[in-house]
From Swiss-Prot:
It comes from Danio rerio. It is found in: Cytoplasm; Nucleus. This is COP9 signalosome complex subunit 3. Belongs to the CSN3 family. Residues 197-365 form the PCI domain. The gene is cops3. The keyword Translocase does not apply. SUPFAM superfamilies: Winged helix' DNA-binding domain.
Length: 423
């Protein structure tokens, strides 16, 4: 091993033993070029370091190995990274979250290129646990995990992370990028869409769209298109975005989504034939955007919406009559829709198989059973917790030096303008 590398190993050991993590971070940041020049000796360096005791030194070496243009032995490197992430010292890693996250991004990109996304899911779950100060902290690796779950069509591993409300962002020594935030909410929305949890999907797409922005983001544009489609499936209309949404959404993103706005306008007419015609007209656009599946679900939801409208007019109706009123192909398709809607709790009805009549019923829920009361209690507890969290965050902002300085500056400007008006 070259003398410079020996010095690197000795410094890593010494600083780790002394607990001087800040100085060790400075060392590994400066050693990238040295390590890159000695690629053939890096496995020897890894052998001289202990993963648990010298986590930052091992991290620096693995990061450089993964940065190589052509990785000669990917399987060996993959095993080294897998072992490192599972056994490294989390307290040490939090001093170099930027490099640690960078290693996770490199791993993700390599697995995506090799079309092996499933292999990285459990590794990234461990990486997130190592990085986080608490479970409600968002890291850039969350977006990587969601991307791999989407590509592997294995959604469930990401759900426990998506279900947690994020209260904080891991700054990663200034390396955290807005792209990671947008990707997390965009990919998360896609995962919830795949799981048919449209309410949560809509929330995630809304977070991506309403992120403060000064320029058009392609991620925000794609999230906006899916937001329109999921809105129609869930509510039968496009939900209005909050007032704090950036002006670029109305100025630039909406004009780039004309096909989706047309679809929403036709959807509002409750006419399936017109909607099918529009879907055929813009089929290339929907296919290019990978939204064909969602568009088909929009068409299906319009049939369901029209069936729900019939429940407000009729007490009983034949399947044949329902099919003609809703523009379905026949009584068999009408029966299929009604059965699915009964199963999903979207309507309350029964079908008489003898005469093919559908009887519509009132909602049987009386809101007076123990399970419902327990659910109400749980919802009230959530509201109380949210109120406490908002008070805590408000207090943090009130004593934040930057906020106080800005507030004082604004007050001085107001006093100055009043004084000048009196003079």
């Amino acid at each position: 091993m070259a003398s410079a590398l020996e010095q690197f190993v000795n410094n890593v050991r010494q600083l780790s033993a002394q607990g001087q993590m800040t100085q060790l971070c400075e060392l590994i940041n400066k050693s990238g070029e040295l390590l890159a020049k000695n690629l053939s000796h890096l496995d020897t360096v890894l052998g001289a370091l202990d993963i648990q005791e010298h986590s930052l030194g091992v991290l620096a070496v693995l990061f450089v190995k993964f940065s190589m243009p052509n990785i000669p032995d990917f399987e060996t490197l993959f095993s080294q990274v897998q072992l490192f992430i599972s056994t490294c010292n989390g307290e040490h890693i939090r001093y170099a979250t930027d490099t640690f996250a960078g290693l996770c991004h490199q791993l993700t990109n390599a697995l995506v290129e090799r079309k092996q996304p499933l292999r990285g899911i459990s590794i990234l779950k461990q990486a997130i646990d190592k990085m986080q100060m608490n479970t409600n902290q968002l890291t850039s690796v969350h977006a990587d995990l969601c991307q791999l779950c989407l590509l592997a069509k294995c959604f469930k591993p990401a759900v426990p992370f998506l279900e947690l409300d994020m209260m904080d962002i891991c700054k990663e020594n200034g390396a955290y990028d807005a792209k990671h935030f947008l990707c997390y909410y965009y990919y998360g929305g896609m995962i919830y869409t795949g799981l048919k949890n449209f309410e949560r999907a809509l929330y995630f797409f809304e977070q991506a769209i309403t992120t403060p922005a000064m320029a058009v983001s392609h991620i925000m544009l794609e999230a906006y298109k899916k937001y329109i489609l999921v809105s129609l499936i869930l509510h039968g209309k496009v939900q209005q975005l909050p007032k704090y949404t950036s002006q670029i959404v109305g100025r630039f993103i909406k004009p780039l989504s004309n096909a989706y706005h047309e679809l929403a306008q036709i959807y509002a007419t409750n006419n399936p034939a017109e909607l099918r015609a529009l879907v055929n007209k813009h089929s290339e656009t929907f296919t290019r955007d990978n939204n064909t599946g969602l568009v088909k679900q929009c068409l299906s939801s319009l049939y369901k919406k029209n069936i729900q409208r019939l429940t407000k007019t009729f007490l009983t109706l034949s399947l044949q009559d329902m099919a003609s009123r809703v523009q379905l192909s026949g009584p068999q398709e009408a029966e299929k829709y009604v059965l699915h809607m009964i199963e999903d709790g979207e309507i309350y009805a029964s079908i008489n198989q003898k005469d093919g009549m559908v009887c519509f019923h009132d909602n049987p829920e009386k809101y007076n059973n123990p399970a419902m009361l327990h659910k109400i209690d749980q919802e009230m507890l959530k509201c109380i917790e949210l109120d406490e969290k908002l008070k805590s965050m408000d207090q943090e902002i009130t004593v934040n030096p930057q906020f106080v300085q800005k507030s004082m500056g604004t007050q001085e400007d107001d006093v100055g303008s009043k004084t000048s008006s009196y003079s």
